[in-house]
Structure formats: structure tokens, C-alpha cells
Amino acid sequence: MLASAGGYWPMSAQGVNKMRRRVLVAATSVVGAVGAGYALVPFVASMNPSARARAAGAPVEADISKLEPGALLRVKWRGKPVWVVHRSPEMLAALSSNDPKLVDPTSEVPQQPDYCKNPTRSIKPEYLVAIGICTHLGCSPTYRPEFGPDDLGSDWKGGFHCPCHGSRFDLAARVFKNVPAPTNLVIPKHVYLNDTTILIGEDRGSA
């Protein structure tokens, strides 16, 4: 029934249905708006990096106090293996003999910070810091520090060999010619906090 000037008159079934429909639409719109507001909160929160994600990308420290000449230390940074190699005097002396056999002996391709664009690709000549991922298809090469092994040839002066497809890198992480890998291994940003601690993933410019 609806009020009129003369009292009340009956509402048709069609009118009742239309009114119900309007009420339902309005109620649904209100609930939908409120629900969207609540749904937005976890979505926005999910776009913020979690503590674990931030930690995964954070710099890591490498303690080299017990790293003997010729030895390699593996550190995990951003989910990637990072190598720290303590090169012996013999290893350093052999580096220049590799130059004619390398794709990029002077590190012209920017695979390293500017402060590592030198013959040893390092801050301190005796310590190499490199990401242990082959630049071909992302395998992790094997550390082969020995000189002249049977499987790598008499002219091998130590380095890294990728068993997946045969790429080779010397002890400055520089790629040899005629192998699948196109570029030298990546040298990450790093800085020496003291004589025995390297901070990997950060340097003086970003500290």
C-alpha cells in the first residue's frame, strides 16, 4: 500500500518487485564498497617487501681470516653463490699469460665496478670476489685451481670450468675464447670493512 491524498491505494506486484530490486542493489553496493576497502589493505601490504625479502637482498659479510692461499670461500648473496678466492703469488703471476686467449682481457664489458676494472679484477690483488654463475646459461662453474690437469690441458693456469657446456674462466674470472659463455663473470660491489672482512653487495658509494 502507498499513501495518497485520499488515503491508501494498493501497489502492484510489479511495483513491489522494482522497489525490492532497488533496495537489494543499494545494499549490495554498500557491502561491495566496504568489502573492497578491506580487500585493498592486504593487497597494498603485499606490495611492500617483507622482512625476509629485504634480508635476502641485503649485503652480506665474508670472513676471510682463515682463507689460505689457493682456497675458495663460498658465500650466498641474493640467492646467488659468491666466490672469494685467496690467490697465491703463483696464481697472480700466471694471469697475464692468459691474456691472448681471453675474450675480454681488459674487462671492457662492464661486468664489474669501475674500481675492479684492472688486471686482477679486484680491490686487493690477492682476493678475487666474483659471482659464481656462468654467463652462458646460469650454471655454476667448478673451481679448478690446479695447473695443467689432464682434462683441461697443460696450458691451464687455474680458474673455473663449467661442466655443463665447457665454458672456462681464468683466476680473474675472465672468459676464454671459443667457449659458449660470452662475457666475463660478474664482480659484485664490495668493500673491505677491515683486513679480514669483506662486505658483499655494497661499496663506499652506496654505503
Curated annotation (Swiss-Prot):
Binds 1 [2Fe-2S] cluster per subunit. The Rieske protein is a high potential 2Fe-2S protein. It is a single-pass membrane protein. This is Ubiquinol-cytochrome c reductase iron-sulfur subunit. It is an enzyme of class 7 (translocase). Disulfide bonds join 139-164. It comes from Allochromatium vinosum (strain ATCC 17899 / DSM 180 / NBRC 103801 / NCIMB 10441 / D). The keyword Cell membrane applies. Its cofactor is [2Fe-2S] cluster. NCBIfam families: Rieske_proteo. It is found in: Cell membrane. Its EC number is 7.1.1.8. It comes from the Bacteria. Keywords: 2Fe-2S, Cell membrane, Disulfide bond, Electron transport, Iron, Iron-sulfur, Membrane, Metal-binding, Translocase, Transmembrane, Transmembrane helix, Transport.
